[in-house]
Swiss-Prot record:
UniProt cross-references to PROSITE patterns, sorted A to Z: ABC_TRANSPORTER_1, ABC_TRANSPORTER_2
Role: A translation factor that gates the progression of the 70S ribosomal initiation complex (IC, containing tRNA(fMet) in the P-site) into the translation elongation cycle by using a mechanism sensitive to the ATP/ADP ratio. Binds to the 70S ribosome E-site where it modulates the state of the translating ribosome during subunit translocation. ATP hydrolysis probably frees it from the ribosome, which can enter the elongation phase.
Cross-link (Isoglutamyl lysine isopeptide (Lys-Gln) (interchain with Q-Cter in protein Pup)): 338
Keyword Protein biosynthesis: yes
Domain of life: Bacteria
Keywords: ATP-binding, Cytoplasm, Hydrolase, Isopeptide bond, Nucleotide-binding, Protein biosynthesis, Repeat, RNA-binding, rRNA-binding, Translation regulation, tRNA-binding, Ubl conjugation
Reactions mediated catalytically: ATP + H2O = ADP + phosphate + H(+)
Pfam families, A to Z: ABC_tran, ABC_tran_Xtn
Protein name per Swiss-Prot or TrEMBL: Energy-dependent translational throttle protein EttA
Location(s) in or outside the cell: Cytoplasm
Length: 558
C-alpha cells in the first residue's frame, strides 16, 4: 500500500464566483478515520465528489493511490432501477458473488464429471474466495441488510422512499469494502441502533474513511481526525470531535476578537464536553430553578445581536405552561398516544424521541389545537404564547426569496418584542449575502429547515415547539441553536434524533416506548438523553431497553 491513499496538491475548486477549495494541499493516510465538518455551503460534498472521481478540480492535482479502490455514499445515491433491494445490495459484492456462484457450479459438475481442469479451477476459486473471506457472503449480506433496516429483499427499488434508497446504497457500499470509503451524511434516515451498529463497524473498518456528518456523537466515536472546511481553506485536526472543539477554541483565541462570539460558543460547548454526567444533570436541574432570574435578566437586555442564533424573550410565563392529562390520540384507527400525562415546567427543554410515524408531530398538533384529543385533556396556560411552524412548511411561497419570506419585504421586522434589521436576523440562520436572494422553492433540506427555524423563533413566544430542527444542520448552526435554547428564559419542546443536542440541552425526555403489547406507550423522564438511556436499562433491563435489532457483528468471519 502506498504511503497515502489519496493526495491533493494545490487544489482549487469553484462554483461560479464561490470558491470551495483555494490552493488546498492534503494527504490522507490508509486506514485513517476522518470526519468532515464546516458550514453549509462550504463544499463538503464537493470534496467527496472530487475524491470519488465524480468531479474534477479547476486547478491542481487530486489522485487516488495506484491500485486502490474508492466508493461513495451520495446524498441522493443512484441505484439500479431494474433490480430489487437484494439485487442492488448484491452488486456491492462485485465479482466475489460471481466467483462464489461459479465455485458452487463447479462443485456440482465435479460430482458427475471429475476432471483435472475443473479441479484446478476449483482450487483457484477457493484460494480467491478464502482471500476475500467470502464463504459466509449470504450471511454477511443478510446481517448488513438487517442492521441498516433495509426494506424487504424482494422489493423493487422503484417503490422506495429517499431514506430507504440511502439505506440500500449504504448497505451495498459497505459490502463492497473499498480501500477509501466516502460517506455523505451516513446517519441520515437511520434509527438509533443502526447508527450504533454503523459506528462500531466503521471504527474497525480496515480502509480509510471520510465522513461528512452533523452527528457529533458519531464524530466523537468514529473519527480520529477532523477536517474542517471554511471559506476555501482546509484545517486538519488530529483527534475526535471533542478534541477538535478544544483545538479550534485555541486557534480562535490566537486570531483575536474578530471571532469572539464563535469562540464563546465553542468554549461553552467544550465546558459541557469536559463535565461529567453528574455535573450535567446538576446544571439541567439548576435551569429549572432559574426561570425568574433568567427572565428578569433577559428583560433588562432588550438588544438582540444576530451574529449567532438568538431566541427573543417572550412574555413572562405563569405557573401553568401545558398540562396533559390521560391523553389518548389515534389516527386512521391506529392508537398513537395512550394514557399520557405530563406537565411542562416553565423553564424546561423537553426532547421528544421516537421513530418516524409514532405520533410525535401529532402530539405537537394536539398541543397547539390543530388536532383534538380522542379522550383526556390538554390544558395550555393563560400566559402561554406559542411559537410553532408546521413541519410541512405550509404557507411559504416558493417564488419568494428567503429574505422576503421572513421579512415580507421590510427592512426592519418585529422579532418578539424588539424591532431588528431584517437582513441581520436572516443572516443569523446561515443565509449570508446572496443566499438571502434564493427563491424558497429551490432550497435544500437543510436550508428549508433553517428558514423554518427563522420563522418560528421570530414569533417571540414563551413556549417554542420545534419539529426536527436539527435535521440537515451543520455543526456550527447546531451549536448556535443549542446555546440559544440554553439562554432562552421560557419553555421549549423539541422533536429530534440528535443525541448530542438532546444530551446538551434537555431537562426532560418524552420517549416513545411502544411494544407489541402497547404500541402507543410513552414515558416521561426528568433528565437529559444520556440519563434517560441509563434509566431505561434500569427499568427494563439491557435486552428490553435495546431496540429489537441485531447487535454488532463484523461483516467478516472469525
Amino acid at each position: 500500500m502506498a504511503e497515502f491513499i489519496y493526495t491533493m496538491k494545490k487544489v482549487r475548486k469553484a462554483h461560479g464566483d464561490k470558491v470551495i477549495l483555494d490552493d488546498v494541499t492534503l494527504s490522507f493516510y490508509p486506514g485513517a478515520k476522518i470526519g468532515v465538518v464546516g458550514p453549509n455551503g462550504a463544499g463538503k460534498s464537493s470534496v467527496l465528489r472530487i475524491m470519488a472521481g465524480l468531479d474534477k478540480p479547476n486547478n491542481g492535482d487530486a489522485f487516488l493511490a495506484t491500485g486502490a479502490t474508492v466508493g461513495i455514499l451520495q446524498q441522493e445515491p443512484p441505484l439500479n432501477e431494474d433490480k430489487t433491494v437484494r439485487g442492488n445490495v448484491e452488486e456491492g459484492m462485485g465479482d466475489i458473488k460471481i466467483k462464489l456462484d461459479r465455485f458452487n457450479e463447479v462443485a456440482e459438475l465435479m460430482a458427475t464429471d471429475y476432471t483435472d481442469e475443473l479441479m484446478e479451477e476449483m482450487g483457484r476459486l477457493q484460494e480467491e474466495l478464502d482471500h476475500a473471506d467470502a464463504w459466509d457472503l449470504d450471511a454477511q449480506l443478510e446481517q448488513a441488510m438487517d442492521a441498516l433496516r433495509c426494506p424487504p429483499a424482494d422489493e423493487p427499488v422503484t417503490n422506495l422512499s429517499g431514506g430507504e434508497r440511502r439505506r440500500v446504497a449504504l448497505c451495498k457500499l459497505l459490502l463492497s469494502k473499498p480501500d477509501l470509503l466516502l460517506l455523505d451524511e451516513p446517519t441520515n434516515h437511520l434509527d438509533a441502533e443502526s447508527v450504533q451498529w454503523l459506528e462500531q463497524h466503521l471504527a474497525s473498518y480496515p480502509g480509510a474513511i471520510l465522513a461528512v456528518t452533523h452527528d457529533r456523537y458519531f464524530l466523537d466515536n468514529v473519527a480520529e481526525w477532523i477536517l474542517e472546511l471554511d471559506r476555501g481553506r482546509a484545517y486538519p485536526y488530529e483527534g475526535n470531535y471533542s478534541t477538535y472543539l478544544e483545538k479550534k477554541a485555541e486557534r480562535l483565541a490566537v486570531q483575536g476578537r474578530k471571532d469572539a462570539k464563535l469562540q464563546k460558543r465553542l468554549t461553552e460547548e467544550l465546558a459541557w464536553v469536559r463535565s461529567g454526567a453528574k455535573a450535567r444533570q446538576a446544571k439541567s436541574k439548576a435551569r429549572l430553578q432559574r426561570y425568574e432570574e433568567m427572565a428578569a435578566e433577559a428583560e433588562k437586555t432588550r438588544k438582540l445581536d444576530f451574529e449567532e442564533i438568538q431566541i427573543p424573550v417572550g412574555p413572562r410565563l405563569g405557573n401553568v405552561v401545558v398540562e396533559v392529562d390521560h391523553l389518548d390520540k389515534g389516527y386512521d384507527g391506529r392508537a398513537l398516544i395512550k394514557d399520557l400525562s405530563f406537565s411542562l415546567p416553565r423553564n424546561g427543554i423537553v426532547g421528544v424521541i421516537g421513530p418516524n410515524g409514532v405520533g410525535k408531530t401529532t402530539l405537537f398538533k394536539t398541543i397547539v389545537g390543530l388536532e383534538t384529543p380522542d379522550s383526556g385533556s390538554v390544558k395550555v396556560g393563560e400566559t402561554v404564547k406559542l411559537s410553532y411552524v408546521d413541519q410541512a412548511r405550509a404557507g411559504i411561497d416558493p417564488r419568494k426569496t428567503v429574505w422576503e419570506v421572513v421579512s415580507d419585504g421590510l427592512d426592519y421586522i418585529q422579532v418578539g418584542q424588539t424591532e431588528v434589521p431584517s437582513r441581520a436576523y436572516v443572516s443569523a440562520f446561515g443565509f449570508k449575502g446572496p443566499d438571502q436572494q434564493k427563491p424558497a422553492g429551490v432550497l435544500s433540506g437543510g436550508e428549508r429547515n433553517r428558514l423554518n427555524l427563522a420563522l418560528t423563533l421570530k414569533q417571540g413566544g414563551n413556549l417554542i415547539l420545534l419539529d426536527e430542527p436539527t435535521n440537515d444542520l451543520d455543526v456550527e448552526t447546531l451549536g448556535s441553536l443549542e446555546n440559544a435554547l440554553l439562554n432562552f428564559p421560557g419553555c421549549a419542546v423539541v422533536i429530534s434524533h440528535d443525541r448530542w443536542f438532546l444530551d446538551r440541552t434537555c431537562t426532560h425526555i418524552l420517549a416513545w416506548e411502544g411494544d407489541d403489547d402497547n404500541e402507543a406507550k410513552w414515558f416521561w423522564f426528568e433528565g437529559n438523553f444520556g440519563a434517560y438511556e441509563e434509566n431505561k436499562v434500569e427499568r427494563l433491563g439491557v435486552d428490553a431497553a435495546r431496540p429489537h435489532r441485531v447487535t454488532h457483528r463484523k461483516l467478516t468471519r472469525g
